[in-house]
Amino acid sequence: CAPENVSGLVYGGIDVVSLANNHILDYMEPAMIQTQNILNEAGIAHSGSGMNSYEAYLPTIKSIKGQVIAFLASSDRTGQYNNYQPYLNAGENKSGFAYMTPYYIRQQINSVGSFADLIIIEMHAGSEYSHAPGSDYDSISRLEDFRNMKTNPASLIGFQMTPDQESEIDDYSWRLDRPKLWDRAIRHFAIDEGADLVVVHHPHIIQGLEVYNGKLIAHSLGNFIFDLNYPETYPSMILNSKADESGFTEF
């Protein structure tokens, strides 16, 4: 995509974008930095990528009509599950995107919870070309453990963590995670932790809208302007909503 195409985003009124996706390092660090700089020059805020994990997890904060809105972005499309290297998630001394796990979602939400009136989480995740969220890893017991933070995804390969709400996880390692995160469960978890709206992209086609505990989850809005030669990818949606101090309404 040519850098000058950012003018289309400006013309379309785009104010905030997520850079947490599996293509952010397609042309390595120089292209990621160029992308960030072009967006900065165009006045478009972004989150979800960085030269290290600290930068990648930083939120975008917007104050709109007296409401402070935090935009959090992350992805689980690291390449670890197929051993596609180099992995795409950022690390302590490695560029990439913010890695999406229950542990890090909780940390992201906690980092803005004290001052943000509304929290939007953008997730680049899910099954491509699937019309409904979910995966082969869903099970009733696993979903319940997931919601209670009793089981880390890494426990699927023998690594277990059982943190309480306030404790530090000394033996936690992202290297042991796998992105089998039970699509609906991790989105429910984000709402339970304090998110007001969850928007998901990556499947390339429209998936369902779900209201969970009074909060909306858009499981996939389609491609918007990402053209593919598959008829099922042609439809797309724009999500409209009003917001006040109580949250997002009138979807």
PLM region descriptions:
Residues 1-251:
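Acidic, metal/ion-coordinating pockets
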